[in-house]
Amino acid sequence: MGNQLAGIAPSQILSVESYFSDIHDFEYDKSLGSTRFFKVARAKHREGLVVVKVFAIQDPTLPLTSYKQELEELKIRLHSAQNCLPFQKAAEKASEKAAMLFRQYVRDNLYDRISTRPFLNNIEKRWIAFQILTAVDQAHKSGVRHGDIKTENVMVTSWNWVLLTDFASFKPTYLPEDNPADFNYFFDTSRRRTCYIAPERFVDGGMFATELEYMRDPSTPLVDLNSNQRARGELKRAMDIFSAGCVIAELFTEGVPLFDLSQLLAYRNGHFFPEQVLNKIEDRSIRDLVTQMINREPEKRLEAEDYLKQQRGNAFPEIFYTFLQPYMAQFAKETFLSADERILVIRKDLGNIIHNLCGHDLPEKAEGESRASGLVVLVSVITSCLQTLKSCDSKLAALELILHLAPRLSVEILLDRITPYLLHFSNDSVPRVRAEALRTLTKVLALVQEVPRNDVNIYPEYILPGIAHLAQDDATIVRLAYAENIALLAETALRFLELVQLKTLNMENEPDNEEVDEATRPNGDYDTELQALHEMVQQKVVTLLSDPENIVKQTLMESGITRLCVFFGRQKANDVLLSHMITFLNDKNDWHLRGAFFDSIVGVAAYVGWQSSSILKPLLQQGLSDAEEFVIVKALNALTCMCQLGLLQKPHVYEFASDIAPFLCHPNLWIRYGAVGFITVVAHQISTADVYCKLMPYLDPYITQPVIQIERKLVLLSVLKEPVSRSIFDYALRSKDIASLFRHLHMRQKKRNGSLLDCPPPEDPTIAQLLKKLLSQGMTEEEEDKLLALKDFMMKSNRAKANAVDQSHLHDSSQKGVIDLAALGITGRQVDLVKTKQEPDEKRARKHVKQDSNVNEEWKSMFGSLEPPNIPQALPKTSDHEVVQPGKPPRSESSAGICVPLSTSPQVSEAAHIPSKKPVIPVVSSTVLPSTYQIRITTCKTELQQLIQQKREQCNAERIAKQMMENAEWESKPPPPGWRPKGLLVAHLHEHKSAVNRIRVSDEHLLFATCSNDGTVKIWNSQKMEGKTTTTRSILTYSRIGGRVKTLTFCQGSHYLAIASDNGAVQLLGIEASKLPKSPKIHPLQSRILDQKEDGCVVDMHHFNSGAQSVLAYATVNGSLVGWDLRSSSNAWTLKHDLKSGLITSFAVDIHQCWLCIGTSSGAMACWDMRFQLPISSHCHPSRARIRRLSMHPLYQSWVIAAVQGNNEVSMWDMETGDRRLTLWASSAPPLSELQPSPHSVHGIYCSPADGNPILLTAGSDMKIRFWDLVSPERSYVVAGSTGSPSVSYYKKIIEGTEVVQEIQNKQKVGPSDDTPRRGPESLPVGHHDIITDIATFQTTQGFIVTASRDGIVKVWK
């Protein structure tokens, strides 16, 4: 802006905030620095943060317009340069005090990024250098020179995308070498004295003598543009190349600049060369690149494009050119503003990304680790999105991406870039995200095989404290994830500690190594660190082992309790883990937890040693008598494994063998197999003498013959006796007095053995009845012996089940979310809807239970009040035979004969389980109850009858609606069989003043309606279209909706018409058609106005008639599918279409109204199940051409007919499979090709089943009406078209599995014109002269076609 400004001192210095008082779109946020040339601030704008550069105007006459025009032209030129960020706005006089420049705010520049953690690695530096050269190349190709490239003007986003900004074409090109004032004023904004300016820009100070003289003259203005032209000479490309080289050098030397001002001037004169700084660049290719770029001779510097080509495969990996640059550029576009969208796009492309960056799908690093290191660039994109993700799905997708990429990333990236974000996710508000973050963190840390020097204490100081809160998380799934992964976390932490210790020892033992750096030495010695680690993990393990949810404890045991034993050591494994695990067997309600104990105990016992066998023996015995047979199986397997490992003492082995032998006749197959497994392992472990002397006596009662090879499972299984019958076993086990049963069975056995002379029948009638039941189920003497063999097990199991039942009652009463109605004194009532057979009066008894007085009245109303006022307290005595059987509550019957079972009180229920000879329950006679109680029952009965009647009516309506849909016809009046319209014009109607958008015919074919852009809806009488009258006019016109009427549909016959306009209005009109054709009337009934921003205007509509509801379904341009219930004026349903598939253009409804299909502007066809309002399938046209019109196929339920943009294509798609079944192709282009030499499209379609021979009528932009015979395609023809159109033929062929009916123009015959006789005098063309927008048919005495066109014409044909 002229060198003279450098020497002028401003008369007044104002703060940058003061300049914002005159601009209203920007709100001052904070200052970003201030120099004499520019004051820089950050401001808030409705579109985000912006950088505002303020130039204080000292002279109001200063001409700044030319500079503004230059900056605006620069902005236009750089519009497509994705690595350039020019000023978006320039205000030469934003106020009287200043001119301002505006651009988007980016947080970090390259100077700051170099010194910010995590530090850039080598591949990231190369990527940034590559982008710097790319940005310079983009600018130069656009005809723009930067003029001030430096690290402060290279912006770096959070995902390492480079933006070259603050283009300085307004700054002087040349500077005096003997006066640093200009350099300080224009270029040294950071006050670092760093110089990036090309040496040729410093010239002899003599050329500025004239300007200096001007400055001495007080009358000279601040800037004299004419005298400043020498300083504003043309910027050369080589100047930018030099500056870019200095920036790249500073990038690779960790912020050490190549030149300051004095060094650059010396370099210009050949007295200095920055060799010392260049040698700090370790990469030789980068060093050579920088050396070439800072060549003192500008002619020897190449173009940026040449450097990119030269260093391809050298300084810059090939993957930058082939994949990363084009792929990453898509995220710089404005369309990718959402972090969620970026993550979902990367997840979708993950396979392609890994293939390109790694060359294979496996994490091996065989060829070119540099290719896999390109993933670091992608990781920066992922991590930059993590903190701004909104949806749960996106967060889970991001964690999934990290997990896929982690095996291919370096240790530094995993610890410095990935781990902090995973810990961030561990504090997310969504439990699923917290749980998945913990799992991902565990797996990522397990991949680390070496610990960098900076991360020696990462576990005790960062990771474990960062996730400590998850052990007490409110969500069970989070604690579950912690329990699932804590063993691996502890294992990895111990490995980290050992790696650090080993690394420290190796460094200390190296003879040529200096004193070990304190940073690499862990705090204190190894034992202290290990103890601290043990305490941290132990605290969380104990918390999880004491968790209120059993599933957390179970998961901890199943997911690595053995690894925790190894981590803690033998002493703590016994004191901490085993002591807590033992308590799990006290939970009698959750057999899964008890089973998990026996699954895990083997690993713990193996680590603790055989000393634990005395502790475990009673626990294992308890498992063998568990109430749940699955737990018994797991206990047997645990015993077998412990015996194999030698963890059981020999006396204990024999004791267990005696307990387990009876299981050989247990009815459960798994238990028998488990017992056989234990017996065979014991036989294998002990000597042959012990087998026959100590083991065989236990087995003899259960085998059919003596056996030698007991240690072989198959042998032992083959000689086992048949097990006890399951029915007998279960019935005996459920007996309440099982001890008495076994005493009697034992006496019967003694009698059989001869040791007892007589066995009297049992005195207790209960035992007698039980024995009788067992004998009736087939219990033999052999079965009795087997039951006696299982006596000890069955007795213990019976007691265990009884205890479990008692504890379950206690447990349920305090369980969250469970309401104990009995405890509240509330009696449930069940009413039989079928009148039962009357019982004798003496059996019709009603039991009264006194209820708590504080029961809520609302509950009494729902469940019934059984306590009448002033009920007599004295109860009559009942006979002994009135016994209430368990499970069959006493019944109460009202005067109407409705039976009402009444539940017993808790005391009665409890008494029912106590063995008693006469469990008599007192009942209340019905005669005792006062009349108020009967009135309450009568009221309940009335309400019940009303409910039944309501349900019957509802069921009736649903049945009628179902029958209506099942019997639904395609149309009430289909065309007559063999109908083939001749194309004779019957009526030419020109009442509309603008394009007609839609035609609809009423169900009875009495009327048809048209809507137009002229804002009118016209109703026409079909009967008048037969050509018998001289003039044909519409019978009704409605024009009060406003806007352009885009679509309409008839509702419920001919009486209602729904219309929609582009102004968001939807109206339901009533048509009084009963007096046709005399004086019809039309009037609005209902209306609604859609939100144009939220929904947009309606593009298509249809009517659902489901019997119970009359629903008007309409689709809007913004993707809403709404069902408007016309009977209640509310929405029956609302669906939301994903606009990523394109805007909705049309939709069609299945004839049975079970599903609908929408078509979009991007060629997608999406199906929705209307029963559940869920999307079910989506398919897309191969060319993604716009869907013009959709219709259902009249014969095939899953087919839709779609008219698409171009080639007059109409295709029939099977939405169930996604296949294109049939295509009608009225174009000269090759069938099914995606080329479109024919721009014509079908805008209107009509399809009819036509008595099993479906036909299709199409019309569109070529102004022709075509008749397609879908059964015999060769019989298709053009019904009406423009005069002189060539004749056509139709041929059927199969292309790529799709049937195609193609229209082919016949060759014109060459010869005299009179070869073909004329039918009459030359007639005027009767076809349409503009695009046909819709087509329909109606039937009167014959079939008619009605078409409408864009010029407002409606024509009727026959």
Swiss-Prot record:
Example of a GO MF term: ATP binding
Record-level GO BP terms: autophagosome maturation; cellular response to glucose starvation; early endosome to late endosome transport; late endosome to vacuole transport; phosphatidylinositol 3-kinase/protein kinase B signal transduction; phosphatidylinositol-3-phosphate biosynthetic process; protein targeting to lysosome; receptor catabolic process
Occurrences of domain Protein kinase (ranges): 26-324
Topology with respect to the bilayer: Lipid-anchor
Chief place where the protein resides: other
Post-translational modification: Myristoylated. Probably autophosphorylated.
Lipid anchor positions (N-myristoyl glycine): 2
Enzyme Commission identifier(s): 2.7.11.1
Active site: 148
InterPro entries listed in its UniProt record: ARM-like, ARM-type_fold, HEAT_type_2, Kinase-like_dom_sf, Prot_kinase_dom, Ser/Thr_kinase_AS, Vps15-like, VPS15-like_hel
Enzyme kind, highest EC tier: transferase
Residues recorded with modification Phosphothreonine: 1316
Cofactor dependency: Mn(2+)
Subcellular location: Late endosome; Cytoplasmic vesicle, Autophagosome; Membrane
Residues at which ATP binds: 32-40, 53
Phosphoserine found at: 808, 813, 853, 865
Subunit-structure text: Component of the PI3K (PI3KC3/PI3K-III/class III phosphatidylinositol 3-kinase) complex the core of which is composed of the catalytic subunit PIK3C3, the regulatory subunit PIK3R4 and BECN1 associating with additional regulatory/auxiliary subunits to form alternative complex forms. Alternative complex forms containing a fourth regulatory subunit in a mutually exclusive manner are PI3K complex I (PI3KC3-C1) containing ATG14, and PI3K complex II (PI3KC3-C2) containing UVRAG.
Its biological purpose: Regulatory subunit of the PI3K complex that mediates formation of phosphatidylinositol 3-phosphate; different complex forms are believed to play a role in multiple membrane trafficking pathways: PI3KC3-C1 is involved in initiation of autophagosomes and PI3KC3-C2 in maturation of autophagosomes and endocytosis. Involved in regulation of degradative endocytic trafficking and cytokinesis, probably in the context of PI3KC3-C2.
Recorded family membership: Belongs to the protein kinase superfamily. Ser/Thr protein kinase family.
The protein's name in its UniProt record: Phosphoinositide 3-kinase regulatory subunit 4
Organism: Mus musculus (Mouse)
Species lineage: Eukaryota, Metazoa, Chordata, Craniata, Vertebrata
